[in-house]
Amino acid sequence: MDNLTHSLVGALIGQAGLKKKTGLAMPALIIGANLPDVDAACFFWLEGTEHLGFRRGITHGPPALILLPLVLAGLLYGFDRWQARRGKRPEGRLPVSFKWLYALALLGCLTHPALDWLNVYGIRLLEPFSSQWFYGDTLFIIDIWLWLLMGFATWFSLRREKRGGDWRKPAHWALTLGALYIAGQGMITGAAERGVTESPTGTAVVIASPPPLMSWKRDIITGGNGLYTMNADTTFPGVPLDRCDLDAVRAADSQVDAFLFWARTPYVVPQEDGSLLLQDARFSDPRAAGRFS
């Protein structure tokens, strides 16, 4: 999911009451909820599509989910001590507990892979023990309805807190409604996939992909072996992948290797100049295809 969604989840957990457990609880929750995306630093040393084979992997696996919150808790604890030594520590800040900082950073961090799993992009939940991709196919990467729900609830909770009202309840309601919304989206995906009985390119692979905005609909991708159809009426150009020597190409080109490692529904698009372009049917929309090919 996008980082705004991750941040709002962390903020709502804090507004639900956990921010009173220790000083700097909100930074621990919000930064922790985004912490696995530290792998975005790979853009500094990887080229082209190589980042596709790196992201949502090692920093989203079990060891990182334990160690990254430990680093964050240590930094926040050290920051509090540094401010205290300089006489700059805010008077209204609660006493800082390292144990609670770590627990909250860990909780925030754990929400990250849970949310990332929900979309078609995928996540390698078990790195470095396994490089298997997992897909929830439940939400689009950016869900405007979750933004509106969680954004309003966060604002309303903070507003109530300033006025001395019950500020925890809006966060409780938002988290509950958000969970019910996600469960409903999962049911829509399941029903859409079960409704597929045939396709011009076969049904070896069936993906019900949530589109942006219209979360009640699904783009149905069907096919296999490099031949795919979208919504039963759009068949993508391609050739059977078992006729291609992909192993040789992967060995010769690290970008092709990374792309095919990440791709779930890869297909080959012949170009006018005679070259071949690899794409993924999940991101075949012209607005996104250039970033995933």
Where in the sequence are the language-model features?
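N-terminal membrane-targeting hydrophobic helices
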Residues: M1-P210
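Extracytosolic and intramembrane catalytic regions of membrane-associated proteins
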Residues: G202-V205, P210-S293
